[in-house]
Amino acid sequence: MITLTDLFCGAGGSSTGAVQVPGVQVRVASNHWQLAVDTHEENHPDTGHVCADLSQIAPRYYPRTDILWASPECTNHSIAKGARKVVPDLFNPIPDEAQERSRATMWDVPRFAEVHRYSAVIVENVVDVARWHPYQAWLIAMDSLGYEHEVVFMNSMHAWHLGDPAPQSRDRFYAIFWRKGNRRPDLQRIQRPPANCEVHGPVAAIKAWKTGKRVGRYRQQYVFRCPEVSCRGREVTPAWLPASSIIDWSDLGTRIGDRPRPLAEKTMRRIQAGIDRYWSGQERDPLVVNHVSGSDSTRSTSVREAAPTMVAGGLHASLLVPVEGREGKAPQSVAEPYRTQTTRNETGLLTPFIAELRGGGSTARTVTEPLATATASGTHHGLTTGKSTSIEDARFRMLSPDEIKRAMAFPAEYRILGTKRDQVRMSGNAVTPPAARDLVAAVAASLEGAA
């Protein structure tokens, strides 16, 4: 049995992924927020739990394990840090202590590693931690403790190695450390998602950086290419799970024209932009908001622009619309992965008003073939052809905490405690289980080989 410590465990995404690897046991999990610890214990009752500010506790208090997983404070590294600090709360205030100290610092990783001499360490953070000024000093500190390392930049929608990925585009930084002299984990294998090449058909895609600087996000700094030499680096798009797979289609929301309070002006503009672009032709394709921080926001995309490996299925003429005030947020197909989930609920669901959808007895239907990798949940209705849908006749609602939980790829039975706001926050802070699963699997395989 390979044992693992999960520091800054939050709601338990990293632990949930780790225990999906055969032979791996999470021995202890720790976080400073009691509600997060309670949530973790609710779902992982066989794990030991410690509620503590990790920057203020002695590492010797914790048992030694084979692997350390750590997800230190990411707020000060994120490009979203520049956002206004006061954000209207959709439900109720977050506890002050959780607001001020969501996680401990990156320096707690070498502090714990110095005491416990873990066989391997995995550190998760936002992509921009690689631009943190003490980043190189932090790596040197781990090197001085006897570790070699490899840094992986991975999007959770590409974590296909041991199962389905997350239905969400979520770029993250992962630093993997192993003891000098131990076997190097095969991290390249887990970064080859399935794709479809126009020439060679199904392939295991290879990552290709656009420049010599290997730091960044999918599409912005790297893409995937066909591995066959004869293709001469033909770009391919990996398969993904659509956002439609996490939406409860039995709840269509309220007709916009019937809402007692109008939606915000920016939200209405985004809805109208999506309708004008995608619902003005013969087919009203489903759309979803792709809400990415920073200036390089992802463009709106129709489901008909999907990669050949993703066959449209289980789709709905719908929009997910961001409701927060920042510019540059655009609608995108629900056949695309869900946008990166933050700690706030900022995404709404818009569906066209179709009479047959008002009843509860409609059977599941799709517009084309079903997805090869997954089917959408709930009841579904095929798209219709016709003229542009009026904005007043469309239905709109916010995504529920349960839908956001599923967008993070937590199991359906996973229980996240607290208020709706607490649940959204814990989901947004979590590690997606598929990414943790694949990374822990690679590390565990290297340790078994060494043994």
Residue ranges and their predicted role:
Residues 91-102:
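A short acidic, glycine-rich active-site loop
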